[in-house]
Amino acid sequence: AHALQESNFRPDAVSPAGARGLMQVRPGTAGDLIRWRGISGDPGRLTDPVNNIEFGQTYLEYVRDLPSTGGLLPRVIASYNAGPAPIAEWNSRFDQSDPLLFIETIPYWETRGYVPIVLRNYWIYEQLGADESPSRRALVAGLWPRFPGMAGPTAVRIDPRRPQTAMGRD
């Protein structure tokens, strides 16, 4: 879902910011991931699809595990695009109880557009695989969908009176 939006599946894509490859990973981010996560990829070969996807997936897992995203899918997607620091700031400035309101109030116009497009891409892939979409059902119900494959409930409701706590939903 990210690779479609980031590069339209072009392994040689390069952004104005210097991000490269299918998942549009910047060389500095790749170097950080080697230090932080101990992966064995080569930051000098970001146009190699296998190498690039390893870095991109590892970065998704990294931002998934940050306290600022809490593993919540819209926040993880936003963090992949905007970086982790803005997400922490937005969490403290905006009501966190409604995930759709979070998406619509993202101050960066690029990221505000990016999140629903990546979600749409993800849902299309789910549908092609004949899978139900827990994340889509969660958003319709006003719940925060969690990053796929995480242990525990597939979605949570954030208590607006205590934004750091979440109530699980299966």
Describe the role of every protein-language-model region.
Residues 1-169:
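Catalytic glycan-binding domains that act on GlcNAc-containing polysaccharides
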